[in-house]
Amino acid sequence: MEELQGYLKKDRSPQQHFLYPLLLQEYIYTLAHDDSLNGSIFYEPIEFIGYDNKFSLVLVKRLIIRMYQQNFLIYLVNDSNQNRFGGHTNSFYSHFFYSQMVSKGFSVIVEIPFSLRLVSSSEEKEIPKSQNLGSIHSIFPFLEDKLSHLNNVSDILIPHPIHFEILVQILQCWIQDVPSLHLLRFFLHKYQNLNKTIQSNKTIYVFSKENKRLFWFLYNSYVSECEFLLVFFHKQSCYLRSTSSGTFLERSHFYGKMEHIIIVCCNNFHKTLWPIKDPLIHYVRYQGKAILASRGTHLLMKKWRYYFVNFWQYYFHFWSQPYRMHINSLLNYSFYFMGYLLRVLINPYAVKNQMLENSFLIDTVIKKFDTIIPIIPLIGSLSKAKFCTFSGHPISKPIWADLSDFDIIDRFGRICRNLSHYYSGSSKKQSLYRIKYILRLSCARTLARKHKSTARALLQRLGLGFLEEFFTEEEQVLSFIFPKTTLFTLHGSHRERIWSLDIIRINDLVNN
C-alpha cells in the first residue's frame, strides 16, 4: 500500500494553470476551428454554420454572461421553434453557433496542461515521437504474440458514467482553475437540461455529437481513471518490452489522480489486491471496449471481474452490470474487436520421429491467432450507408448522382482501398472480394442513374476495366512496396498478415 501511495503522490502533482483567461483570446477559436489541427488528432472535424463569423473579446464576454443566465436555455428552445415556423432573423442557429464555438474553444484550452504533461512524460521515458501517435494496427501484433499462449479472455464493455458530475470531479485534481471547472459544469448541465426540454434521453449521444472533441477528452480522462490501478499493478508485476502496446494510442493515458482513491483502496480493496498481481495478465483497450486475457484459471478471471465491478462501484459510485464482462475460454470463443473477428485456432500436427530402425508418430498441437473479416457486419454497414440492401444486393447511391463521374468513382474507390488497407491483417481476405463486388456494382449503378441508363449498358459501353484504376487491389499496392527479389510472394498475399503503421482510426464503415 505504501508503494501505491507513492505512485499516486508522484503522478498526482497539482496543476497550477490559469486557463480561464485563455478563453478570451481570439486565437483559441482559430485553433478550435482549424481543420488541419482537428485532422491531426482522433476527432472528426465538425462543420459549423456561419464559419465567416469573427470573434472579439467583447462578443465572447457577452456570450459567456448570457450563457450563465437562467433563461438562456429557454430562449434558445423558444427561438428555435419560432424560427422554424416564422423565420425570425435572430435564429437559433446563430446562438447555437456561438455557444458551440465557446465550447470548442474551451475543449482546446483544457487539453493544454495534459498535452504538456504528455510531452514531458514522453521525454522522461525516452519514447520516440513517432510512437506517441501509433497506429491502431500495433495492437494486433501484440495480441498475435500473446493470445495464442493464454487460456481465458474477458470481453469488457467500459460503462459510461451515469452523471456528468463524475467527469468534473475527475478533472478537479488536474485543473485547479475554478472558473474553468464552473464553465465545464455549465456546459454539461446545459446539454442535460436541453435534452430534458426536448424530451430526449440520449444525453451522452447528443453531447458527443455536438462537441466530439470535448466529449472524447472527458471520456478518455474517465477511462484513464478506470485503468489507473490496473496499470499500477501491471507495472509492479512485469515490464512490457513492447512500447507500442502501452504508448498512449489515443492520447488518453493521463497521470493525475484523486486523493481519496487511497482511502478507497484501503477500505474496500484490501481483500482483492493479492490476486491481481499476476504477471500473465494482458490488457488491451480501444475506445470503450477492452480485452483482458490470462494464462490463469477461470477463478482468477472472476476475481478480476470482482475487482472491476467493485472499483467502479466505490470509486465512481455506480453499479456495473455483470453482463458487461464476459469470461470465456480462448479455445472455444470468438469475439469482435476493432472491426475484426478474433479467435485462437488449434492446428493438430503429426510429426514422424525416426530413431535408428524404429519410427513413431508424435501428435502435437499448435495454437494460431486467427483474424477474420466479419462479412455480415460489414454488409450491414454498407446497407446503412445505402450502398446495398440488407441482404447485400448492390444499389445506387442517389445522393452522389449529382457529382461528376470522376468524383463518384473516386469516392467509391477510396472506400474500397481503405477497407482493403485496414483488413490487410486478415488471415483470409477472400471475404473482402464480396465487399469489393458490392462497391463496384453500386458505383456502376450510381453512374448509370446519373446518365439515365442501366448498369449493364454502361459496363458494355465502357468495358469492365474502366474501374480498375480506382479500385486498386492490395496486391498491386504491395508490388510497389516490396522489391521483386524479396521472398514475400504476392501470389499468396491473401494469406499473409500485413499490419499497417499509418492507420490512426477505424474507417466509418468498419464495425467497431
From Swiss-Prot:
Keywords, comma-separated and alphabetical: Chloroplast, mRNA processing, Plastid, RNA-binding, tRNA processing
Subcellular location, record wording: Plastid, Chloroplast
Residue intervals passing through the bilayer: none
Major subcellular location class: plastid
Alphabetized InterPro entries for the sequence: Domain_X, Maturase_MatK, Maturase_MatK_N
UniProt-listed GO biological process terms: mRNA processing; RNA splicing; tRNA processing
Any one GO MF annotation of this record: RNA binding
Function per UniProt: Usually encoded in the trnK tRNA gene intron. Probably assists in splicing its own and other chloroplast group II introns.
Family according to the record: Belongs to the intron maturase 2 family. MatK subfamily.
Protein's UniProt name: Maturase K
